[in-house]
Structures are given as structure tokens and as C-alpha cells.
């Protein structure tokens, strides 16, 4: 253990990071298709590099106009992020956009459209007719460390990234560019966050900016201090924090010109910042028939309601599926010794209150809607800036009654 205590670190990135551009494009294409045809089956992957965007994957949809307009959807999202000039290293209006999308495999579709329960076992329940789109395991987590019931390091890192984008877009720091990263290291004592140890903020900027005289003080005042004042965490001492702004020096060459980007390469940023486990599946570009996405959302919904109901101070839940089967093959609940009720009772109550078949998750969270583009940056969980159905605390009373 360090003399400074147990140190835990999480990172976030801005929407202009190359990987996040790809997540945003994939989810914008998904939303456009779902808006026109809620039953669209979508698995879209994006790659960006200098001057080019490649969008590939599998789509089955009746939304012919939206499908034909994918190129314009791609350009619009890039411009919205802020890449609108070659001076910034990328321009959504002039970059090359290559589309290579085919249809969903009929072998996969048969298991999703007619699950094993209906096809082989003769189940009559309509919710037994939709099978999982793949095998896999998904985790959800919640902890009472923040109002949004998220681990503090990732919650703070996301707030810093959102603030970086906010001061760029609203003109407070107009010399900032879209690409950026944040990292937060917090000291813990007995699982309580006690001290903000280190904050790293790296941001792309215009070429003529003086790092020491302008960028460093501006980031401290307009980004870090604003976020810390808003956070006002009761146990966290930030008085001795070490702040590193652009520790490599200048950061002019960024975005796709600085690094190639791919959909699904920021899965820890997307979830719990490494504080909780991850099943390995990415989210962006996937319609909710893919349990990688919908079941991970459902598990966050479960975990958040368990903590909000006072059944545990923190909880991690895992669910697992077999491709083509509706019912989960496994459910695991871990309360880390913080439970206020018997963990066996908590697991039983979860099974009674939440229907974790894919069709039921889609129904209960109303997932066949164009709600995914805002999740492509700043995390899918614990969001305070957008309303997401898996963040609702609508099962607290049901869990209490079930216990």
C-alpha cells in the first residue's frame, strides 16, 4: 500500500476522442434507423483515420430512406462534435465516407426471432419467443458513493470531460479543440474516498496557445475548480490535489489525424471506470436485441434499485445468456458484505421483481427508441445530463415488498 493510502484511478475521454467519434457515429446510425423502423436489427462498426470514415456491419431494416442517408448522418454527427475544419485535423463536411453494410445473418436471426423456448419447448408466452442475440455475460453495479450511485473516480472523470466540451462549445475557452482525456486518482480509507490525489487533463488546443500562461490556469479555473465546486463531495479533500495539464506539452495534432479510432474500444470508460467487472461486450452501434447492450443496461437498473432500496451499500450483479434462449442461464449477486438483508433473499427478490428475458428488458425499458446517441460519450451509467430509462428508480418499493 502506498504511504498516500489506497489509490484508485479512472479515466474518461471527450466526444472528440477518435474512439468516441466512432461510437457516436455508430449510435447515430442506430438512432436514425430505429426512428424510422423500431424493429431494425443493427450492428454497426466505425473506423476513423486521417480524412476518412469507414462504416461497416450488418443491418436488417425497412427504413430505406434512413439507410440511404447514412452518409449524411455520419457527416452531421462529426460536425456536431466539432470537427468542422481542416485546421482542427478533421472536417465532417469534406472527409471521405465509405459504407460497407450487409444484412444480418439468417442463422443469428432465427434464434432471436424464434427462441429455443418457443421453437423447441413449445412455450406460448410471447416474451419466450425472443432469444438472446448471442451468448455472453453482463455486469451491473451501483454504490452509494455519489448521488448517481456510481463510483466516485469515474463519476468525477466524466464530469471533467463533459466540462471540457462545455467550455469549448459555449465559447468560454474557444481555443480548445474536440479531442481530450481526463484521469482521476482518489485515495481511499476503508472504502471511503478521502482525498483527491491526482487529476490529469489533456486537451487538444489551437497552435498559438501558451501552455503555462493560458492553458494551464484556464483549465484549473474554468474546468477543474468548477467541477469540484459543483461536486461538493462531503468526504473528499481536494486541497492538496496534484493537477497535470497536458503533461506531454503541446497537443495540437489530435482527433483522427493523431490516432485512428474504432467503435467499442472504450468499454471501461463507458461503464464503471474499472471499479466493477465487465463482461467484455461493447455497446455502441448495437440495437437492443443484442444483450451485450440491453442486458448490461438492465443489470445497472437492477443494481441501482437494490442500492436505492437500502438492501446494500454496493452491489454487483451478473447475468448470462445462451444464444437463441430467452431465459438467462445464470444470475449472480455480490454485495461485498454491505448488505442489510440476507443476500439469498436479495437474489430471490431480484428474480421476482425483474424479468431478464431479452424481450422483457426491451419492453420494460422501452428500448426500441432512438435514445442511444447521447450515450456514446461520457458514460452509459450515472448520467446527470440526460434521462435514461435504466437509471430510473422505479423498482425500489417492489424490491422492499419482495424482501
From Swiss-Prot:
<keyword id="KW-0554">One-carbon metabolism</keyword>
<feature type="binding site" description="in other chain">
    <location>
        <position position="17"/>
    </location>
    <ligand>
        <name>ATP</name>
    </ligand>
</feature>
<feature type="binding site">
    <location>
        <position position="259"/>
    </location>
    <ligand>
        <name>L-methionine</name>
    </ligand>
</feature>
<dbReference type="Pfam" id="PF02772">
    <property type="entry name" value="S-AdoMet_synt_M"/>
</dbReference>
<keyword id="KW-1017">Isopeptide bond</keyword>
<comment type="subunit">
    <text>Homotetramer; dimer of dimers.</text>
</comment>
<keyword id="KW-0630">Potassium</keyword>
<feature type="binding site">
    <location>
        <position position="45"/>
    </location>
    <ligand>
        <name>K(+)</name>
    </ligand>
</feature>
<dbReference type="InterPro" id="IPR002133">
    <property type="entry name" value="S-AdoMet_synthetase"/>
</dbReference>
<comment type="similarity">
    <text>Belongs to the AdoMet synthase family.</text>
</comment>
<dbReference type="GO" id="GO:0005524">
    <property type="term" value="F:ATP binding"/>
</dbReference>
<dbReference type="GO" id="GO:0004478">
    <property type="term" value="F:methionine adenosyltransferase activity"/>
</dbReference>
<dbReference type="GO" id="GO:0006730">
    <property type="term" value="P:one-carbon metabolic process"/>
</dbReference>
<dbReference type="InterPro" id="IPR022629">
    <property type="entry name" value="S-AdoMet_synt_central"/>
</dbReference>
<dbReference type="GO" id="GO:0006556">
    <property type="term" value="P:S-adenosylmethionine biosynthetic process"/>
</dbReference>
<dbReference type="Pfam" id="PF02773">
    <property type="entry name" value="S-AdoMet_synt_C"/>
</dbReference>
<feature type="binding site" description="in other chain">
    <location>
        <begin position="265"/>
        <end position="266"/>
    </location>
    <ligand>
        <name>ATP</name>
    </ligand>
</feature>
<dbReference type="InterPro" id="IPR022628">
    <property type="entry name" value="S-AdoMet_synt_N"/>
</dbReference>
<dbReference type="GO" id="GO:0000287">
    <property type="term" value="F:magnesium ion binding"/>
</dbReference>
<feature type="cross-link" description="Isoglutamyl lysine isopeptide (Lys-Gln) (interchain with Q-Cter in protein Pup)">
    <location>
        <position position="345"/>
    </location>
</feature>
<feature type="binding site" description="in other chain">
    <location>
        <position position="290"/>
    </location>
    <ligand>
        <name>L-methionine</name>
    </ligand>
</feature>
<dbReference type="Pfam" id="PF00438">
    <property type="entry name" value="S-AdoMet_synt_N"/>
</dbReference>
<comment type="pathway">
    <text>Amino-acid biosynthesis; S-adenosyl-L-methionine biosynthesis; S-adenosyl-L-methionine from L-methionine: step 1/1.</text>
</comment>
<protein>
    <recommendedName>
        <fullName>S-adenosylmethionine synthase</fullName>
        <ecNumber>2.5.1.6</ecNumber>
    </recommendedName>
</protein>
<feature type="binding site" description="in other chain">
    <location>
        <begin position="250"/>
        <end position="251"/>
    </location>
    <ligand>
        <name>ATP</name>
    </ligand>
</feature>
<feature type="binding site" description="in other chain">
    <location>
        <position position="104"/>
    </location>
    <ligand>
        <name>L-methionine</name>
    </ligand>
</feature>
<feature type="region of interest" description="Flexible loop">
    <location>
        <begin position="104"/>
        <end position="114"/>
    </location>
</feature>
<keyword id="KW-0963">Cytoplasm</keyword>
<dbReference type="GO" id="GO:0005886">
    <property type="term" value="C:plasma membrane"/>
</dbReference>
<feature type="binding site" description="in other chain">
    <location>
        <position position="58"/>
    </location>
    <ligand>
        <name>L-methionine</name>
    </ligand>
</feature>
<dbReference type="GO" id="GO:0005829">
    <property type="term" value="C:cytosol"/>
</dbReference>
<dbReference type="InterPro" id="IPR022630">
    <property type="entry name" value="S-AdoMet_synt_C"/>
</dbReference>
<feature type="binding site" description="in other chain">
    <location>
        <begin position="179"/>
        <end position="181"/>
    </location>
    <ligand>
        <name>ATP</name>
    </ligand>
</feature>
<dbReference type="GO" id="GO:0009274">
    <property type="term" value="C:peptidoglycan-based cell wall"/>
</dbReference>
<keyword id="KW-0832">Ubl conjugation</keyword>
<dbReference type="GO" id="GO:0035375">
    <property type="term" value="F:zymogen binding"/>
</dbReference>
<dbReference type="InterPro" id="IPR022636">
    <property type="entry name" value="S-AdoMet_synthetase_sfam"/>
</dbReference>
<keyword id="KW-0479">Metal-binding</keyword>
<keyword id="KW-0547">Nucleotide-binding</keyword>
<feature type="binding site">
    <location>
        <position position="282"/>
    </location>
    <ligand>
        <name>ATP</name>
    </ligand>
</feature>
<feature type="binding site">
    <location>
        <position position="259"/>
    </location>
    <ligand>
        <name>ATP</name>
    </ligand>
</feature>
<keyword id="KW-0808">Transferase</keyword>
